[in-house]
């Protein structure tokens, strides 16, 4: 069953040109339209794209709220550890000929960060345009000298929402949690990994388990648009030349939407999409997240799906990198166990993966955690993939991780010590702030 994408062009045009939103008022309607014009033209120029009927409403939701155009013919590589992702990233950076756009929440001054920085410097000195956005809070402890060599090589470096006095400004709440790399407008990276040693080497007590993607194809237009909107936000420079959106032939078979969410628009796009996807699941919906502080909307969707007989599974780290957040996460588990959600604690190390997969058809990977901060306060980005081959790979990754888990059962979970339950309840009150 299918839906022909070209049937929605009129509605696409309305939502593209007709919506008045706070985000557009901040960035400027004309700027917003110009930045989105190139990917829209490429989207409309596609052959009549066959969209999966089961997800036509989800695809429409993302198009109507974030102008996230669904592009087909993409190739996807999945990385489940930092070493393989870093190796691929360095290789693709070395292959850059025209431009590199790179955006991370954390870009650490350590062996891994310096390795990537040195490649960026080398490419900039060879004439490649390089632009970097880092989050000011995520990189709070990174010394200025780390960026000096990049600046001296001609790399344009910008911090996102610079914070001078973190204890006295609300800006500290609104952080850019995105992880985006775009190379020559043709290859992109998106996922949960930042640039720091711990993402590659883990901790003394276990590995760092994460998920990241390489995308090749027109879906990179979505990553490019997200980066250039953020670049305009931090630099007030409009970059929209055609060379940043090259014409491409199909390199694979995956249909992909790049979906962003932020605290300055009227919608909670990724949260709304996940709620719809969970509610629409027919057979199963599997979730990996390092933190589980769900909004009422997500909590209700998970409970309702499980009560309706859908196999809903949640995988969390047994040991987290933030004890408060982990306590808060644990406070919600009885609520979903009672509804029949299966819960697994990953015991091999720290699970930082933000992977979800459903019904062998839909999967998503990105920067978004299942928590208030990601849904309400952060600038986030996810790839939503409508493709059976990719979904089966994601499902196998989840099931492989499940072998390194211990399952949580309600009859045992309710026997936690009273002081543990009390601590969880107190932290839960602070969930929107964590």
Question: Model-predicted segments: where are they?
Answer:
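A short glycine-/small-residue-rich loop at the edge of a beta-strand within enzyme catalytic domains
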Residues: 265, 269, 289, 293, ...
